[in-house]
Amino acid sequence: MRIGHYQLRNRLIAAPMAGITDRPFRTLCYEMGAGLTVSEMMSSNPQVWESDKSRLRMVHVDEPGIRTVQIAGSVPKEMAAAARINVESGAQIIDINMGCPAKKVNRKLAGSALLQYPDQVKSILTAVVKAVDVPVTLKIRTGWEPEHRNCVEIAQLAEECGIQALTIHGRTRACLFNGDAEYDSIRAVKQKVSIPVIANGDITDPLKARAVLDYTGADALMIGRAAQGRPWIFREIQHYLDTGELLPPLPLAEVKRLLCAHVRELHGFYGQAKGYRIARKHVSWYLQEHAPDDQFRRTFNAIEDSSEQLEALEAYFENFA
């Protein structure tokens, strides 16, 4: 699949997730088979651009793959400026967030709240597309609420504004992450626009990935929560799409290798004072299958030293040897 002049190596994209898709996680997902990874959502508010959090969220020129940054906001001029700043910092694709359902984002008329105001959507998309010379993409939900699904209208508007690809999460804002994602709306959008359409929502395994591609006709898939603690899902899905065969479960020794390497990267990226705190949630996701009683996770989350975290993980996996 192509986005503008960029050719993706496959049709699997790691979704932007606030507090999760930092550089270590993006790099790991790319190594595990994602064709594209997207940064955490960055605010277009210029007052926060120079914060340590924003600097960490920006892409880095030595990252693997096509560097993609997602921005969010409601003011066209600020969104355009944010896009320019990120391109100057190394972004090769700019993604606009109009899908986030979080209240703190929607209260500022950003994220999925914008789906209620097509005229404002048009103003933002036009401003960002004109501001940069790299491809601009858009991520939305199917609408604001089930009774008002307007994703087809927004998709057609996006294409008219010069958006190069569109990701649709198969829920409305009102649905949050409750219930099941629906794919009829994504299928309807695909039939109405010529730009690439990326399906998102509840794509949890290779069989589901194949089914969603076949049903919607989507050009690609975006995978988010299913990759938490399981970044190898991209490799599993791609293998199934290529061969029709399922890979065997990842050996525990490989899970250990990936987890410990990920934790070390988090320690290095965030520093000793913060890295161990960030690592806790990732370790919890990795071990959901192996530590269902939560005892180890509770013990691990009480550790406040990076080296002790790694020692605890080594000891934990030795019990399975």
Curated annotation (Swiss-Prot):
PROSITE patterns: UPF0034. Its cofactor is FMN. FMN binds at residues 16-18, 70, 139, 200-202, 224-225. PANTHER family: TRNA-DIHYDROURIDINE(47) SYNTHASE [NAD(P)(+)]-LIKE. It holds the Pfam family Dus. Its EC number is 1.3.1.-. Gene3D superfamilies: Aldolase class I (3.20.20.70), Putative flavin oxidoreducatase, domain 2 (1.10.1200.80). Belongs to the Dus family. DusB subfamily. Keywords: Flavoprotein, FMN, NADP, Oxidoreductase, RNA-binding, tRNA processing, tRNA-binding. Catalyzes the synthesis of 5,6-dihydrouridine (D), a modified base found in the D-loop of most tRNAs, via the reduction of the C5-C6 double bond in target uridines. It comes from Klebsiella pneumoniae. The lineage of its organism: Bacteria, Pseudomonadati, Pseudomonadota, Gammaproteobacteria, Enterobacterales. It catalyses: a 5,6-dihydrouridine in tRNA + NAD(+) = a uridine in tRNA + NADH + H(+); a 5,6-dihydrouridine in tRNA + NADP(+) = a uridine in tRNA + NADPH + H(+). The active site is at residue 100. The keyword Phosphoprotein does not apply. CDD domains: DUS_like_FMN (cd02801). GO terms for molecular function: flavin adenine dinucleotide binding; FMN binding; tRNA binding; tRNA dihydrouridine synthase activity. This is tRNA-dihydrouridine synthase B. InterPro entries: Aldolase_TIM, DUS-like_FMN-bd, DUS_fam, DusB, DusB-like, tRNA-dHydroUridine_Synthase_C, tRNA_hU_synthase_CS.
